[in-house]
UniProtKB/Swiss-Prot annotation:
Transmembrane feature ranges: 22-27, 29-44, 56-68, 71-83, 98-106, 109-115, 151-157, 166-177, 194-204, 207-219, 235-246, 248-259, 279-291, 295-308, 321-332, 335-344, 360-369
Topology, Periplasmic side: 28, 69-70, 107-108, 158-165, 205-206, 247, 292-294, 333-334
Subunit structure: Homotrimer.
Extracellular topological intervals: 45-55, 84-97, 116-150, 178-193, 220-234, 260-278, 309-320, 345-359
Name of the gene this protein is made from: ompF
Assigned protein family: Belongs to the Gram-negative porin family.
SUPFAM superfamilies per record: Porins
Protein name, entry field: Outer membrane porin F
Organism taxonomic ancestry: Bacteria, Pseudomonadati, Pseudomonadota, Gammaproteobacteria, Enterobacterales
Keywords on record: Cell outer membrane, Ion transport, Membrane, Porin, Signal, Transmembrane, Transmembrane beta strand, Transport
Length: 369
């Protein structure tokens, strides 16, 4: 009996992180769902890598909908994350991951504004499914439209106005976030000028989906003048990808490039400095298989980001990220799971950029609702 339940529940959990959210209100066209998880985790690594030790956190979110008419629906979502690795006396490492609201117009799509995922992540999300690591070749939080970011106005359309099944697209505008705006105080590397982006995915059938995205933004004055050797006026990113998800097999691939955008840490005179790469070429490959009767899902992935023209002479290329991830999930039931993940770093320990090249092993337990 337990095996039959797992065979049904586990695929549902893999579709979305809020698959088993608790419905706390549903009346007169108003609906409110609560979801969250507690993820207790410990990582083992060389002490010099700064990746050894506890990395536990808790996360909670609310999703709401209100039916305005038979053609118009309002919606909103808020998600908050709290790190649990510090002391009670320390300032809590907490942050708002998502906070947006909008309107959905039947088959004409939805329009929302707030803190949300950038359109470049629509494709990158397919490979960002590893137990601990992954998704870091190109996507970065508060880095234009490659990951979660602030000030995003997003239009999304499903099934191309109801005319083509499986053809989805999104258009996005991002307002400036810098010392010149109301939310000033952020690092130069996490600032952005006005920009736009678009993405499209198509469900071909037979478990196959393909997609791509493009984003182009103005850079702030500080980014052009003070950070690394990326002096271009515009920041650009694009990616293409594909995934296969059927018969308990999951395969995904993503290739993308960025210009004047990607943050990386480099050791200069024994001091770590955060810089912006002039150009990066990024690849992520993921393979997983779900043994649904056992509740076991092994995972294998390859992740690489190669920086191009990183020095003043514009002639030095070097890997910013390069590793293999070997791990697995084990699902006790729909609410409780455990996992292990081993990051085999393929960077040379004496690489010229001084990028962290240590292996990391992590293990954790997750309760989600």
């Amino acid at each position: 009996m337990k095996r039959n339940i797992l065979a049904v529940v586990i695929p549902a959990l893999l579709v979305a992180g809020t698959a088993n959210a608790a419905e706390i209100f549903n009346k007169d066209g108003n609906k409110l769902d609560l979801y969250g998880k507690v993820d207790v985790r410990h990582q083992f690594a060389d002490k010099r890598s700064s990746e050894d030790g506890d990395d536990s956190y808790a996360r909670i979110g609310i999703k709401g909908e209100t039916q305005i008419s038979d053609q118009l629906t309002g919606f909103g979502r808020w998600e908050y994350n709290v790190k649990a690795k510090g002391t009670e006396a320390a300032v809590a490492e907490s942050s708002t991951r998502l906070a947006f609201a909008g309107l959905k117009f039947a088959n004409y799509g939805s329009l929302d504004y707030g803190r949300n995922y950038g359109v470049n992540y629509d494709v990158n999300a397919w490979t960002d499914v590893l137990p601990i690591f992954g998704g870091d070749a190109m996507a970065q939080t508060d880095n234009f439209m490659t990951g979660r970011s602030t000030g995003l106005l997003t239009y999304r359309n499903t099934d191309f106005f109801g005319l083509v099944d499986g053809l989805n697209f999104a258009l996005q505008y991002q307002g400036q976030n810098s010392d010149r705006t109301k939310n000033k105080g952020r690092d130069t590397e996490r600032s952005n000028g006005d920009g736009y982006g678009l993405s499209s995915t198509y469900d071909v059938g037979y478990g196959i989906t393909v997609g791509g995205s493009y984003a182009n933004s103005a850079r702030t004055a500080d980014q052009k003048e003070k950070v690394s050797d990326a002096y271009g006026k515009r920041a650009e990113a694009w990616n293409i990808g594909a995934k296969y998800d059927a018969n308990n097999v999951y395969l995904a691939a993503m290739y993308g490039e960025t210009r004047n955008m990607t943050r990386y840490t480099r050791t200069i005179a024994d001091t770590d400095a955060t810089l912006i790469a002039n150009k990066t070429q990024n690849i992520e490959l993921t393979a997983q298989y779900l043994f649904s009767d056992l509740g076991l899902k092994p995972s294998l992935a390859y992740v690489q980001s190669k920086g191009k023209d990183l020095t003043e002479g514009k002639g030095f290329n070097g890997d910013l990220v390069k590793y293999v991830s070997v791990g697995t999930y084990y699902y006790f039931n729909k609410n409780l799971s455990t996992y292990v993940d081993y990051k085999i770093n393929l960077l040379k320990k004496d690489n010229e950029l001084g990028v962290n090249a240590r292996n990391v092993f992590g293990v954790g337990l997750t309760y989600q609702f």
